[in-house]
């Protein structure tokens, strides 16, 4: 166990060094990339993230969002939900924002933002155990949670649930924040919030739980899939996706298979609610309805034909060919049942079969023989 931890730590240090070297020229890294390549794969606890940020900063790397804005920009946004449309509230997602969300945004929108000096004073007070300062620091950054949470809408959780999970991460950030390291609180809290939300999505959003690092890999693959769709004008092949993501086609197929969502058999089909998906899926264990119906009709026709024979003839055929229990018997076995010789049973059987071959009887069974 200890060796595994040492190996993981060594691998992580190598990855961080490579990350800094690859971004040294630009001096900038996207926050999503930091999360996907460093935070999630190594399942960093949030208290370890500040050390990572410090190492990146010391390495000359600044953290931004995908639009190139500093990752702290969310903390200074004014939220006025009454002036925003659903699309503006949730970015490019098409989900509708309901009244509870708007009410919540209105409530947090009236909380005044903090200046750098106020933030520092509150952080010091929190370290000294001031509960009121802790509450003020958290409330002033609730809109940060909203801004981050809206980037994860459409991944299987309701917007308010994402906000709730993000708020849990925010509270942890308030407890652990160390102002003396020089980071703005919003920079530090962002990672706690993102980690709380991504873990919640991995744990709750899917019927079958998928590890956090795999969830991020799936999300990245889906993004590349969409980009290729726009570039090519058609759905990309696993080979094309693999080339873009620097992995093998087999690995892409494996990820796509993992990404598939289970579908409930109770899923409604059509406009009426009385039809469900399960109604249209064949049960391979149960006998095919057509075969079952054919077998029942054959049994009925056979019984009718056998009724035209004598009782002894009928019973001999039933025993010889196993018509009742599926077990065929020899002439000798049947002879013992009737206490006659096997030759006598052969004669009775031959006479019964001649009768069945007569057109008046055979026509009832001929269709089944031809099928």
UniProtKB/Swiss-Prot annotation:
Ranges where the record places region Sigma-70 factor domain-2: 137-207
Main location: cytoplasm
Superkingdom of the source species: Bacteria
MF terms (GO), sorted A to Z: DNA binding; sigma factor activity
DNA-binding region, residue range(s): 331-350
Compartment(s) where it occurs, according to its Swiss-Prot or TrEMBL record: Cytoplasm
Gene Ontology BP annotations: DNA-templated transcription initiation
A GO CC term assigned to this protein in UniProt: cytoplasm
InterPro entries registered for this protein in UniProt: RNA_pol_sigma-70_dom, RNA_pol_sigma70, RNA_pol_sigma70_r1_2, RNA_pol_sigma70_r2, RNA_pol_sigma70_r3, RNA_pol_sigma70_r4, RNA_pol_sigma_70_r1_1, RNA_pol_sigma_70_r1_1_sf
Extent of motif Interaction with polymerase core subunit RpoC: 161-164
Keywords: Cytoplasm, DNA-binding, Sigma factor, Transcription, Transcription regulation
Stretches the record annotates as Sigma-70 factor domain-3: 216-292
Stretches the record annotates as Sigma-70 factor domain-4: 305-358
Subunit text: Interacts transiently with the RNA polymerase catalytic core.
Similarity-based family: Belongs to the sigma-70 factor family. RpoD/SigA subfamily.
Function in brief: Sigma factors are initiation factors that promote the attachment of RNA polymerase to specific initiation sites and are then released. This sigma factor is the primary sigma factor during exponential growth.
Alphabetical list of NCBIfam families matching this protein: PRK09210.1, RpoD_Cterm, sigma70-ECF
Protein name (Swiss-Prot/TrEMBL): RNA polymerase sigma factor SigA
Organism this protein belongs to: Streptococcus mutans serotype c (strain ATCC 700610 / UA159)
UniProt lineage: Bacteria, Bacillati, Bacillota, Bacilli, Lactobacillales
Name of the coding gene: sigA
């Amino acid at each position: 166990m200890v060796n595994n931890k040492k190996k993981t730590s060594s691998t992580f240090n190598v990855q961080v060094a490579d990350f800094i070297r690859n971004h040294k020229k630009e001096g900038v890294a996207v926050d999503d990339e930091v999360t996907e390549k460093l935070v999630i794969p190594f399942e960093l606890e949030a208290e370890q993230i500040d050390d990572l940020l410090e190492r990146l900063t010391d390495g000359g790397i600044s953290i931004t969002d995908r639009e190139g804005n500093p990752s702290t920009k969310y903390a200074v946004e004014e939220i006025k939900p009454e002036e925003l449309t659903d699309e503006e509230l949730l970015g490019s997602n098409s989900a509708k924002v309901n009244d509870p969300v708007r009410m919540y945004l209105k409530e947090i929108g009236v909380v005044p933002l903090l200046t750098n000096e106020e933030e520092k004073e509150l952080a010091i007070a929190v370290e000294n155990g001031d509960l009121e300062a802790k509450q003020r620091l958290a409330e002033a950054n609730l809109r940060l949670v909203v801004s981050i949470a809206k980037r994860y809408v459409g991944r299987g959780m309701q917007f308010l649930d994402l906000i709730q999970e993000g708020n849990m991460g925010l509270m942890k950030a308030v407890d652990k924040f160390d102002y003396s390291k020089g980071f703005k609180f919003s920079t530090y809290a962002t990672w706690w919030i993102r980690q709380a939300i991504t873990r919640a999505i991995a744990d709750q959003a899917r019927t079958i739980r998928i590890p956090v690092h795999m969830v991020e890999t799936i999300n990245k693959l889906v993004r590349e899939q969409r980009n290729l769709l726009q570039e090519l004008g058609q759905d990309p092949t696993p080979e094309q996706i693999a080339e873009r993501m620097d992995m093998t086609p087999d690995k892409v197929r494996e990820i796509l298979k993992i990404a598939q969502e289970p579908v409930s058999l109770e899923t409604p089909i059509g406009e009426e609610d009385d039809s469900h998906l399960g109604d249209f899926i064949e049960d391979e264990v149960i006998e095919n309805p057509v075969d079952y119906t054919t077998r029942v009709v054959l049994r009925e026709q056979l019984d009718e034909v056998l009724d035209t024979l004598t009782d002894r003839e009928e019973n001999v055929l039933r025993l010889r060919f196993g018509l009742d229990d599926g077990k065929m018997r020899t002439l000798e076995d049947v002879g013992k049942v009737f206490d006659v010789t096997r030759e006598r049973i052969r004669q009775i059987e031959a006479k019964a079969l001649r009768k069945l071959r007569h057109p008046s009887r055979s026509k009832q069974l001929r269709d089944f023989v031809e099928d």
